[in-house]
């Protein structure tokens, strides 16, 4: 246990452990972790078991789509397996959350490629650390348009520049 939790002797070991586990999640600080822990403790046991099972099942069954690299519980995600989508147009996004944001607009009918990150030399994240290789393999197929929709951050712009200046695999 971390020092913060060692000083919280007023919590039982199990509550402290639950708080510590929640605080490991991104964006969850100590106060939020405490709120979540006490909320879970006050939930009916069936709901807690449902939550725990959903987490375990997702971790065991969710994997990368073999085509676009988004997260899915099938070999090929519903978007890539949809024959009504324009498979000749690929939009490159950084995360599955970015994909979901574009899908919510209902305006895009192509398919996606999820990089699962962006290039960040300052953080030691290079082209080999994101799913660029898979994208280059896809571009060897029948693709008419590549839409680069990385984030407007320095890392997203760096990634977009690399994609824009990379030679096409068909050249």
Listing of model-derived features with the role each one plays in the protein:
Residues 33, 82-150:
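Extended interfacial segments that mediate partner engagement and assembly in macromolecular machines
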Residues 1-8, 164-171:
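Conserved small/polar residues in nucleotide/adenosyl-binding loops
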Residues 104-105, 159-161:
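Short amphipathic alpha-helical segments
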Residues 9-16, 24, 34-90, 95-99:
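Cys/His-rich Zn2+-binding cysteine-cluster or related metal-binding knuckle/ribbon modules and their
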């Amino acid at each position: 246990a971390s020092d913060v939790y060692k000083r919280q002797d007023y919590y039982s070991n199990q509550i402290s452990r639950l708080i510590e586990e929640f605080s490991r999640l991104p964006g969850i600080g100590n106060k939020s972790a405490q709120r979540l822990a006490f909320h879970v403790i006050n939930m009916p046991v069936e709901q807690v078991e449902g939550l725990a099972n959903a987490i375990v099942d997702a971790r065991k069954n969710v994997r990368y789509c073999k085509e676009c690299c988004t997260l899915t519980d099938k070999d090929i995600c519903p978007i890539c397996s949809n024959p009504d989508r324009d498979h000749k147009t690929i939009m490159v996004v950084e995360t599955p959350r970015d994909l979901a944001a574009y899908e919510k607009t209902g305006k895009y009918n192509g398919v996606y490629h999820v990089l699962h990150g962006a290039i960040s030399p300052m953080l030691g994240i290079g082209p080999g650390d994101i799913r660029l290789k898979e994208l280059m393999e896809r571009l060897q197929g029948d693709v008419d348009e590549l839409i680069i929709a990385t984030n407007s951050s320095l890392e997203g712009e760096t990634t977009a520049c690399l994609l824009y200046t990379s030679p096409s695999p068909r050249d």
